[in-house]
Amino acid sequence: MSSRLHNGNDVYEKAEEYWSRASQDVNGMLGGFETLHTPDITVSKRFIEGLKKRNLFGSYDYALDCGAGIGRVTKHLLMPLFKKVDMEDLVEELIVSSEQYIGSDPRIGEKFIEGIQTFAPPERRYDLIWIQWVSGHLVDEDLVAFFKRCVKGLKPGGCIVLKDNVTNHEKRLFDDEDHSWTRTEPELMEAFNGADLDMVVKTIQTGFPKEIYPVKIFALKPRRQETSDDN
């Protein structure tokens, strides 16, 4: 797969440089496409509520926002739903800016300043782990390893959600500006399988301009968890 042609550490360093230069506002977090914010949050909220109705995660107690930036998703999607939300991001300046963007709020838990290529969520803490527009920065082996660490971060019955661009081309595409890959859906399914995750729900983002890559949302459950009653 093409990510093996790139050195992971080199890609990660360049991605950090890119996001360190991004404006610390919603427009910066969305790569200049601020108008995506409202339809993005609307569809994501509907997706989470649908998961809860189907009992695909236990409660609205604790969520984790991976690649949180200044906290756009934390503030507008997760905080209105969950009692407590932790944030993770590689860029310290963005996490620091989140305090001003979100304000002081007891629903904000820990803020982790670390890249997802090494970040290990606290074990058995989260009902929902939300991963949006950040997985494309990881090479294949690091993506699978990250998913495995996320599984350990789930409470029993918890759920992982991946929301990201997906290409309809035969092969993934590499963005030389932000140093990320847009993977194909079969490549993502391969990564899920490598981490023993089953994709239990999938939807496509609506309301985005046609020139934007398709954005899909995947709900993932640990395979062993799903089959434990049969063992």
Curated annotation (Swiss-Prot):
GO terms for cellular component: cytoplasm. Belongs to the methyltransferase superfamily. NTM1 family. S-adenosyl-L-methionine binds at G67, R72, D89, L90, V91, I116, Q117, Q132. Pfam families: Methyltransf_PK. The keyword Transit peptide does not apply. InterPro entries: MeTrfase_NTM1, SAM-dependent_MTases_sf. It comes from the Eukaryota. Alpha-N-methyltransferase that methylates the N-terminus of target proteins containing the N-terminal motif [Ala/Pro/Ser]-Pro-Lys when the initiator Met is cleaved. Specifically catalyzes mono-, di- or tri-methylation of exposed alpha-amino group of Ala or Ser residue in the [Ala/Ser]-Pro-Lys motif and mono- or di-methylation of Pro in the Pro-Pro-Lys motif. One of its GO terms (biological process) is methylation. Keywords: Methyltransferase, S-adenosyl-L-methionine, Transferase. GO terms for molecular function: N-terminal protein N-methyltransferase activity. This is Alpha N-terminal protein methyltransferase 1. Its EC number is 2.1.1.244. It comes from Caenorhabditis briggsae. It catalyses: N-terminal L-alanyl-L-prolyl-L-lysyl-[protein] + 3 S-adenosyl-L-methionine = N-terminal N,N,N-trimethyl-L-alanyl-L-prolyl-L-lysyl-[protein] + 3 S-adenosyl-L-homocysteine + 3 H(+); N-terminal L-seryl-L-prolyl-L-lysyl-[protein] + 3 S-adenosyl-L-methionine = N-terminal N,N,N-trimethyl-L-seryl-L-prolyl-L-lysyl-[protein] + 3 S-adenosyl-L-homocysteine + 3 H(+); N-terminal L-prolyl-L-prolyl-L-lysyl-[protein] + 2 S-adenosyl-L-methionine = N-terminal N,N-dimethyl-L-prolyl-L-prolyl-L-lysyl-[protein] + 2 S-adenosyl-L-homocysteine + 2 H(+). The lineage of its organism: Eukaryota, Metazoa, Ecdysozoa, Nematoda, Chromadorea. SUPFAM superfamilies: S-adenosyl-L-methionine-dependent methyltransferases. The keyword S-adenosyl-L-methionine applies.
